[in-house]
Amino acid sequence: LPAIPDTFRDHRSRNNQLLLAALAQIRPQVDRAIARYGRDRVAVVLGTSTSGLDEGDVHVNLTLNGKASEAWRYPQQELGDPSRFLSRWLALDGPAYTLSTACSSSARAIISGRRLIEAGLADVAIVGGADTLSRMPINGFHSLESLSTTQCQPFSRDRSGITIGEGAALMLLTREPQPIALLGIGESSDAWHISAPHPQGEGAMRAIQQALDDAGIMPEQVGYINLHGTATRLNDQIEARVINALFGERVPCSSTKHLTGHTLGAAGITEAAIGMLILQRNLLLPAQDFSQSPQDDTLPPCGLIEHPQPLSRPVILSNSFAFGGNNTSILLGRMS
């Protein structure tokens, strides 16, 4: 991963190194946006679930063993540090903040970035997120008995929980017409339970419907749904129910978390990026992996695909449903 120099040592974390790796992939577009609009008109909105928490864990362990590290700085573990770091790295003067809403964090960053542009507070927004492995989420999901001992198997009969991954992705939002557009956004709160979805999926359904309404799109116009699909018993059951109610079986769908793991706060942007690449490069839709365990036939049928297939309609829905009933849905589309 890219090294963080001493001039930015207060921001030295694996989380921010992943952000730099993601930034390198869009740096030419970012530089052009800065040159065109000015440093005060480029916003940074990121999502993370843990930020540099692992750096804090390492420091605590060293301190308890009488080996405190001089390299540790408190800002490394702050939730707001990713956006502050990226803004400093690019010498930007526009709005910069980090959202932390668990697994929907970076999807909410996309939504918030669009709203900044619509409100006239920025002309361009760098949106995305990053999350890295640390003890807190591993121990937390273990205490909830939600960690799988093998590769996660969303929507399968023997699914037993999530596999935690790490990753980062960034996108550049702009008013200017682009080949791929953010067509619609939706968000809601269940106000039901801190770690369980609403039993009827009421909030998730509202978020999806908002995104469809925002885009002016009917359910049958969607070509693929990237499901949140964490491989926990309850999440997959409720999401299948929601998709069945809104789309029936007519829209191909799958969860890609068996490929990436659950990247926590980076999941929303990671899966939106997968959707964008499918649209950009005409990639085949990723199939659901039932090689280890067959599909759970007790779930409401919802168009799960078992073999890769082409995208028939150039509109993709991506769902992110987080703890606390924090739901987001975004619609991406290929523009003619």
Feature map (PLM): residue ranges:
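Short acidic, glycine/serine/threonine-rich loops at helix termini
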Residues: E55-H59, M136-G140, W192-S195, D236-I238, ...
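Acidic, glycine-rich active-site loops and adjacent beta-strand->loop/helix elements
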Residues: T48-S51, A102-S105, A130-S134, G186-D190, ...
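Conserved catalytic cysteine-centered active-site region
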Residues: L1-A21, S51-N65, A71-S112, L121, ...
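Conserved small-residue
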Residues: V44, L86, S106, G113, ...
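Short glycine/threonine-rich loop-to-helix capping motif typified by GTGT followed
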Residues: I194-Q200, T230-F247, G265-T270
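Structural signature of cysteine-dependent C-C bond-forming condensing enzymes
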Residues: R32-A43, V60-A71, F85-P95, E118-A125, ...
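Conserved active-site "lid/cap" helical segment
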Residues: L1-L46, G52-L53, A207, A211-P219
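Condensing-enzyme catalytic core mediating Claisen C-C bond formation in acyl metabolism
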Residues: Q151-A215, Y224
